[in-house]
Amino acid sequence: HALTPSTRAVYINSPNNPTGWTLGATDQQAILAHCRRHGIWIVADDAYERLYFEGAGVAAAAPSFLDLAEPDDRIVSTNTFSKTWLMTGWRLGWIVAPPELVPDLGKLIEYNTSCTPVFIQRAGVVAVNEGDAVIAHTADRLRRARDFLQARLQRLPGIEAVAAPGAMYA
């Protein structure tokens, strides 16, 4: 096991970049239980959360530690508008974290991002309020591209192609 007594945090990117691998809810429950017992933080990179192909309906959300979280859990979830809403390069996102981390996270953000331009902030509001159709279209287009590539790779001798359950990588 990679966890040792000195482990302070576990970083999980699911759906994963670049494989599209997705950590299932059962495994998330086991990891969360272990982290609770040992006081280990979970840093969840949820950038591809809504680009998930295995759930019910188009653009279903991937399993998330936030779905399992209790108020006192040590979970930090990061997310971005870049992937889901196709706003790559605009550097707009959000963090879900326990309230006691807010002052330190505020300092980190202040020193790394001096100011997100107002037009990008407004675009983010529109994306959240009106962007479900974009998400559904994007997820469907990516799923079809994955299926297309998967079918062609399976025809090649000696190639075993595993379908990615999420993200934007075939």
Per-region residue spans from a language model:
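Active-site C-terminal subdomain of aminotransferase-like
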Residues: 70, 100-119
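Conserved glycine-rich beta-strand-loop-beta hairpin in the small C-terminal domain of fold type I
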Residues: 125, 141-150, 160-170
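Active-site pre-lysine segment of PLP-dependent enzymes
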Residues: 1-9, 18-41, 48-87, 100
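Short beta-strand-to-turn element immediately C-terminal to the catalytic PLP-Schiff-base lysine
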Residues: 67-68, 92-99, 129
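Conserved N-terminal phosphate-binding loop of PLP-dependent enzymes in the Aspartate aminotransferase
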Residues: 108, 140-141, 152-154
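Structural motif of enzymes handling amino- and sulfur-group chemistry
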Residues: 99, 116-138
